[in-house]
């Protein structure tokens, strides 16, 4: 599968052919929410469109996806949804799906709007992650996995590992892995997700669930989700207006 050229090894044409089934070609981006913790920056602007260091937050993710040759990208919008159309100037291939239920429901309601898009291997990403290492979006994926980094203690959503697979998904823990909002799901697991999301959403209070809790907690037995470990600095999570100001100040100084 490898050929040597000018003292460098490259994947041969036959090797690339073998990799084709594992090439990721689709991504879904969750961008419907209000981002209340970022007020006043989000008073008139969706959090993913807030500018940091000369670039809008979502553009760092979009650029990473494009670098991995992924252009089948659907963005689920809600709050100030018309503003996302400005992205088409640089990313004309984007598709938009509206979720007006974001006001009263959790992000599982966004996934319910794109069940028909879960018919092949797919990245599912949060839109408000400031990606500093584009390499975390890999062109090829071989199994379902979720991005995370090790931490001794956290109050955020996290998980532990059992034989390299995600277990004990909860908010807050010690000696665990902090969840980053980028995951990949195989074609087979996407089909399972379609079924499980619909089942959980139909339950009382189902609309108040985080979608990630469906495969990682409520229906965990149906999946084997591997950790794809990254470094904390690969993504900057901006969870408050104060954190936004601090990052902008670092850029100025």
Give residue ranges: language-model regions:
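Conserved core of the sugar-phosphate nucleotidyltransferase
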Residues: 132-205
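Phosphate- and divalent-cation-binding pockets in alpha/beta enzyme and binding domains
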Residues: 37, 60, 83-86, 113, ...
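Conserved N-terminal catalytic core of the sugar/cofactor nucleotidyltransferase
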Residues: 2-29, 55-122, 205
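Short beta-strand-to-loop acidic/aromatic patch adjacent to the donor-nucleotide binding site
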Residues: 121-130
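Glycine-rich N-terminal loop/short-helix segment of MobA-like nucleotidyltransferase
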Residues: 18-52
């Amino acid at each position: 599968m490898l050929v040597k050229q000018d003292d460098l090894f490259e994947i041969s044409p036959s090797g690339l052919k073998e990799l084709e089934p594992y090439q990721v070609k689709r991504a879904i981006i969750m961008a419907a929410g209000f981002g209340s913790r970022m007020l006043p920056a989000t008073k008139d602007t969706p959090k993913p469109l807030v500018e940091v260091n000369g670039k809008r937050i979502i553009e760092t993710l979009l650029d990473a996806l494009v670098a991995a040759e992924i252009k089948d990208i659907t963005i689920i919008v809600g709050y100030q949804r018309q503003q996302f159309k400005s992205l088409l100037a640089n990313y004309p291939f984007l598709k938009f799906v509206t979720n007006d239920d974001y006001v009263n429901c959790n992000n599982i309601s966004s996934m319910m709007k794109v069940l028909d898009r879960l018919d092949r291997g797919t990245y599912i990403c949060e839109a408000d992650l400031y990606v500093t290492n584009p390499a975390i979006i890999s062109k090829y994926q071989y199994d379902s996995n979720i991005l995370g980094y090790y931490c001794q203690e956290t109050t955020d959503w996290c998980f532990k590992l059992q034989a390299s697979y995600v277990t004990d998904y909860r908010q807050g823990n010690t000696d665990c892995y902090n969840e980053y909002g980028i995951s990949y799901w195989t074609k087979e697991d996407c089909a399972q997700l379609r079924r499980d999301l619909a089942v959980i959403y139909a339950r009382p209070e189902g609309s108040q669930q985080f979608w990630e809790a469906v495969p990682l907690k409520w229906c965990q037995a149906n999946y084997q989700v591997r950790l794809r470990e990254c470094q904390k600095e690969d993504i900057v999570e901006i969870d408050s207006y104060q954190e936004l100001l601090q990052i902008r100040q670092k850029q100025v100084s």
